[in-house]
Regions:
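Extracytoplasmic beta-rich ectodomain segments of secreted or membrane-anchored proteins
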Residues: 137-159
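Bacterial N-terminal signal peptides that target proteins for export
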Residues: 1-10
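Short, low-complexity, Pro/Ser/Thr/Gly-rich segments in the mature regions of secreted, periplasmic
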Residues: 257-272
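Bacterial Sec-dependent N-terminal signal peptides
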Residues: 2-3, 15-43, 265, 269
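Conserved "repeat-terminator" motif of extracellular CCP/Sushi domains
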Residues: 130-138, 196
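Tryptophan-paired
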Residues: 51-103, 154-231, 270-272
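Structural motif
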Residues: 38-51, 144-151
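Structured interaction patches on ligand/partner-binding surfaces of diverse proteins
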Residues: 95-129, 213-252
Length: 272
């Protein structure tokens, strides 16, 4: 069964449950379990444009899935009838339907702006419950470059060692490479942005390349970005990943890394 609207959920569930249930006089060990998913924390954790939230419940060969709108989540609790036993459940948004048996980031792309919650459910009794807490599983990195000749355009390449998430939401080791997208920034400058997955170590690299050079041309400069982020005190294990801003000023030979809460300034030597 799949219930996509909370308003219909109780009636549908009760109707299906009658054909799928037991009387009090019968052995109730084969009766289904009623799983209640508490959605009250979802509306405040998910931006308006990130709905609907997709949920998926699986137990062996059995599975059920559906979509939840913001209005659905604001009603509070969502009920699902399921076979008894252990089960896995997840709720996800921002993944473009890519999260199934985990999430694999496509080569050449950044991490999708995914918010995720996963849990193991003990559904051996007649009732079970869980609270859905969607977590921000990506870091939006914004790069700003100043102090370079306007006649020499650049591009950036990010490389790292995490290529996605497993079914429990843990980072999966693998090759990651993407080119941040340019967009108009402040004061006529260009911002480059890319979404990074949760990191397992500090191996993340930032390459600065000549825009007109071929893909095989060595970069003009490589920054050990993972080490810089670690030295700044950024927490990749936080429940919700913070976004980062990286300001590179080649005229002043400074690098400023920051979030909404703090900034760190480092010096470097470079000739481009």
């Amino acid at each position: 069964m799949s219930f996509r609207h909370i308003g219909q959920c109780v009636l549908l569930w009760l109707g299906g449950f009658c054909a799928f249930s037991c009387s009090v006089k019968e052995d109730r060990s084969d009766c289904p379990c009623s799983l209640a998913l508490d959605l009250r924390e979802v509306p405040s954790a998910v931006p308006e444009d990130a709905f609907p939230v997709r949920w998926h419940l699986s137990q062996g060969a059995w599975s059920d899935t559906g979509l939840l709108s913001k209005e659905d989540c604001e009603t509070g609790v969502f009920h699902v009838a399921m076979p008894r036993g252990g089960a896995q459940v997840y709720a996800v948004t921002g993944d473009d339907g890519m999260f199934n048996a985990g999430l694999e980031i496509e080569p050449g792309h950044g991490c999708p702006p995914v918010r995720l919650w996963t849990a193991a459910i003990d559904a051996r009794g007649e009732n079970a419950q869980a609270t859905v807490r969607l977590r921000k599983m990506y870091c939006r990195l914004t790069i700003r470059l100043t102090g370079t000749p306007a006649s020499r355009p650049y591009r950036f390449v990010l490389e790292g060692g995490v290529s996605g998430y497993d079914t429990s939401g843990y980072p999966v080791p693998g090759f990651f490479r993407c080119r941040p997208d340019p967009s108009p920034g402040q004061a006529g400058k260009t911002d480059w942005t890319a979404c990074l997955p949760r990191q397992r170590d500090d191996s993340l690299l930032l390459h600065i390349c000549d825009l007109n050079a071929g893909e095989e041309t060595p970069p003009l400069r490589t920054f050990a970005l993972g080490q810089i982020i670690a030295a700044a005190g950024y927490d990749w294990t936080a429940a919700d990943l913070e976004d980062l801003t990286l300001d590179l000023d080649f005229a002043a030979s400074t690098l400023i890394l920051g979030t909404d809460r703090w900034t760190r300034t480092l010096s470097f030597e470079i000739i481009l």
